[in-house]
């Protein structure tokens, strides 16, 4: 939440378009060749559909679902916005130029047991107010699996449905400790109940999704697959407690292993659930599962693709988020870039 979406950090890229031409796109360049033709098709389309796009613009800033057509800027930035998250469906991206942020050498993570979901929103707001760098959440299932297969790696709390890992960073170690101390004193919980992680060793182990997948593999002896179609959900921070309640109510009816995690500072939530790929109704079960999860998200006017910039990651379910008019615009954008459906 501190740094926004990946789209905001891209300064330029090199892309191979449908004709095989390679073009470098940055702010200020003048499109030429095939890229000029694409721009001449895209710009009038977006101008014509301004009303429809404004009406369907995601309410949540970090929602990356679909081609990013919401930016009102004029020029090459429009093309960059569309390419980021297109997952190779508009052009083949061969290089990317990112903006970077200075590395802050010192970090400290405060581990907070959340006894009640109703408290999550207030804890998140306190952490954001005290300039935390990141806020990661994991549930009791994640914690128990981690403790079982990697004892002492993750902080363990008894009878705690959710844990928040709030990370602060700074260039100066002394100032970092002062910031963390001030933050902890603002929390509505006794300090002795909190735990601290110095540095990034533990976080670098547990934050990658591969860590959770490995826990599932060990628990199920690789007889079930961790399904991640419900990764990247996003709702407002205010709605997180009731959203989690509705998710849990549904997930508990499945009788399956699941875990809820997420970079919760912006309302990002990811659900990983185990399914048997050899099951008779495997495909049907996955489809019903996705439909149920995304229906809950829709009830909260949330988004279904908040991971990185993967705008088309939930392509079969875009109709859960956008109406037919918007989906038609997406198709026209695709046709402008790749009329022969080469990509």
PLM regions and their residue ranges:
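FAD-binding subdomain of flavoenzyme oxidoreductases
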Residues: 1-123, 127-129, 337-343
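Activity-critical C-terminal alpha-helical subdomain
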Residues: 217, 316, 321-343
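Short acidic-hydrophobic sequence patches enriched in Asp/Glu that either
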Residues: 5-7, 179, 285-289, 322-329
């Amino acid at each position: 939440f501190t740094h926004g979406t990946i789209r905001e950090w891209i300064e330029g890229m090199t892309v191979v378009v449908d004709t095989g031409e390679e073009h470098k796109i940055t702010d200020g360049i003048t499109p030429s060749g095939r890229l000029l033709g694409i721009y001449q098709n895209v710009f009038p389309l977006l101008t014509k559909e301004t009303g429809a796009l404004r009406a369907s613009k995601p309410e949540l800033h970090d929602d990356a679902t679909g081609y990013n057509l919401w930016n009102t800027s004029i020029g090459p930035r429009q093309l960059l916005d569309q390419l980021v998250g297109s997952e190779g469906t508009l052009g083949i991206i061969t290089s990317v130029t990112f903006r970077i942020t200075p590395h802050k050498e010192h970090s400290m993570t405060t581990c907070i047991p959340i006894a009640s979901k109703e408290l999550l929103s207030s804890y998140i707001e306190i952490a954001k107010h005290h300039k935390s760098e990141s806020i990661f959440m994991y549930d009791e299932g994640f914690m128990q699996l981690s403790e079982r297969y990697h004892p002492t790696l993750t902080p363990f709390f008894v009878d705690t449905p959710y844990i928040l890992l709030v990370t602060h960073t700074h260039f100066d170690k002394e100032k970092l400790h002062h910031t963390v101390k001030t933050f902890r004193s603002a929390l509505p919980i006794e300090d002795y109940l909190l735990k601290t992680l110095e540095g990034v060793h533990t976080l670098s182990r547990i934050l990658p999704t591969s860590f959770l997948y490995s826990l599932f593999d060990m628990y199920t002896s690789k007889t079930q697959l961790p399904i991640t179609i419900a990764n990247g959900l996003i709702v407002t921070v205010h709605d997180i407690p009731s959203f989690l309640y509705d998710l849990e109510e549904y997930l508990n009816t499945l009788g399956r292993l699941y875990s809820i995690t997420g970079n919760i500072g912006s309302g990002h939530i990811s659900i990983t659930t185990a399914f048997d790929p050899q099951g008779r109704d495997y495909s049907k079960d996955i489809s019903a599962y996705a439909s149920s999860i995304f229906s809950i998200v829709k009830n909260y006017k949330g988004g279904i693709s908040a991971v990185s910039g993967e705008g088309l990651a939930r392509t079969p379910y875009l109709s859960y988020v956008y109406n037919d008019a918007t989906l038609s615009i997406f198709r026209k954008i695709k046709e402008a870039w790749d009329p022969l459906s080469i990509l």
